[in-house]
Amino acid sequence: MENITFGFQGGRKSRLNDPPDSYAKDFFYTYHLFKSNFNNVNIIEFKNSNSSIKKSLFSFLRYLTTIPFYCEQVLNKKNKDIIKKTNNLICVNQRVSFSLMPYTIYRSLTGKINVSVFIMGLFLDQKRHFIRTILRHFFIYIFCFSNKNLIFLSKEELNFAKKKYSKFKHKFHFLPFSIDTDFWKSNKSFDKKDKIIFVGNDEKRDFEFLKNLPKNLPNLEFVLVSKFLTENDFKETNNTKVINGVWSDKILTDVELKNLYDTALMSLIPLKDSYQPSGQSVALQSMAMKVPVLITDTKGFWQKDCFSDSENIFFMEENTTKYWIERINYFIENKNILRNVSINAEKLVLENYNLEIFFNNLKKIISN
């Protein structure tokens, strides 16, 4: 296997200039391991376009099709030259793949390049105007036809896609997201952890529900990290710290986030119900840091058969303030339950969701 290129939206190249132990490798999708094991491993990233015409054109196309075509941000000469020399292209999400598709589709169909894409939420049904629905299904069909491997981060979405697009199920693979367990590790005593943490920016998080929790738990200290939350959302409370930003902007370094996890007694992940495996990375990071996770039990949870309620995670049945308050208070009063879950959670992640396992499985998928 040679000439491998990873397609990212952004935020990776700049991190490669940082000291290796200063950032987690989670969102590189094992780029570092491929780089150390194979020759000619490259990265392409999105870059804002200066062309207002292109911006308007692809903005209209996105509106019309509901497909994430951001071609103006990635189809530049530099990236095209890299792709010309690429045999295996790994797109870390469908936005990257769709945005490259006008250039890669011919090379894919002629066997000059094998494109593998990580899927998250692409196949979910939503109510749309019938014209947009037709166009969306058309482009998804072309997407499935032209790409070699479609890699799902959630078993549930994989099963859903197999029913909806059964013709392409031979291209479908399941590979759960994994994290840098060498980075996400805690040396802090469980007894010294006392904060409640929330981390997350995807739109399947239930932010409106979350806003009501701190004021109803005034004796607990909350740390909330999200671009969708501000201090103004919690003006009525004095127990909430909000860090507004996203991973790619480096508002918070990975080391700083790790230190926040190290103060946390619990990690909250309230979700809206969907097939999307929302909260996956935060849950695994928390668990590796020995922070028990409270997560809404949704149909999109990525691998139910590996997790057990109250053994290595806490599945929350509903997003009501009363229910979550009762559960949180119960755990505060019974910290031995939290302690046991934190131990089991760390063990589960170390054994099943480390980057070495992810690398070996991804290598098998793209080699076939």
Spans of model-derived segments:
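Membrane-proximal helix-turn-helix segments that form the acceptor-binding/catalytic region
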Residues: 77-85, 130-150
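A short, active-site helix/loop in glycosyltransferases that binds the activated sugar's phosphate group
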Residues: 146-170, 181
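Acidic anion/phosphate-binding donor-loop and adjacent secondary structure
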Residues: 162-163, 173-193, 208, 234, ...
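Conserved donor-binding/catalytic core segment of Leloir-type glycosyltransferases
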Residues: 188-205, 210-217, 223
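Conserved acidic donor-binding segment of nucleotide-sugar-dependent glycosyltransferases
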Residues: 201, 307-309, 313-321, 330-336
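Nucleotide-activated donor-binding/catalytic signature segment of Leloir-type glycosyltransferases, i.e.
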Residues: 226, 231-261, 266
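Acidic donor-binding loop of glycosyltransferase active sites
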Residues: 259-276, 291
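A short, well-ordered alpha-helix in the C-terminal region of glycosyltransferases
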Residues: 323, 330, 337-352, 358-364
